[in-house]
Amino acid sequence: MSGSSAVPADTEQVIPWRSSPAVRVGLSLGIATGLYGISFGALSIAAGLTFWQTQALSALMFTGGSQFAFIGVLSGGGAGAAAVGAASLLGVRNTVYGMTMNALLRPRSWRKLIAAQVTIDESNAAASAQPTFLERKRGFWVAGVSVFLLWNLFTAVGALLGDAVGDPGQWGLDGAAVAAFLGLLWPRLREREPLAVAVVCGVVTALCIPLVPSGIPVLVAAVVALTWGLLGARATRKRARS
């Protein structure tokens, strides 16, 4: 992604907030993604975490895929180290997003710290889809802040619900993590390469399940995906130089 197509900030037309496409997209992403927090909260409690541990994950880790991977490994009987490893590997992409958004939006002083916390799939997507610098800023901040607030709110609702209903399997919530994770993943499988990565990682996970302890297959698949991404980035740079 390149910011070269953005209209310079001092010449672009200013769109009112109420008419801004970036604001609408950001709010829509905030609501849609935030609702998944209910599933995370309930399943985190079922995995053995307390209410405050669950809230800390949403407030500090704050990346849905990593959070679901973390509790998925724990609920499957995996060790804490495997859960942390899986979550960390899935969160590597946010580092790339952060570098991209820093160059694109140029946040300064204390705003850079907040921007780092709300740099996720949704804020990156909302910013990248806009044609002007101002709209990209609006898309990033509206999506990032709205997802953060609603994700944490609905995590609390889900955690309280998890305490109330007991065994999530009685209510079908044991499958909610898979459904929620797929919901987060599905929009990113529209292109050929992400779909190929998902298929390869799925096959690797399935092959590893009978051979290694619980939680390790997710780590192995994450390493495969990370290696694929690094090799792809290197190949892209070589083509650009040639």
Q: Where do the PLM segments sit?
A:
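Helical membrane-embedded segments and adjacent short helical loop/helix-boundary regions
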Residues: 20-36, 49-55, 60-63, 169-190, ...
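Pore-lining transmembrane helices
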Residues: 14, 23-116, 134
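Intrinsically disordered, low-complexity non-transmembrane regions of multi-pass membrane transporters
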Residues: 1-22, 134, 233-242
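Membrane-embedded alpha-helical modules
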Residues: 135-220, 227, 231
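Short juxtamembrane and helix-loop transition motifs at transmembrane-helix boundaries
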Residues: 12-22, 44-51, 75-79, 104-108, ...
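C-terminal ends of transmembrane helices
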Residues: 96-104, 125-131, 183-190, 228-240
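Helix-loop-helix junctions within the multi-pass membrane cores of secondary transporters/permeases
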Residues: 11, 84-174
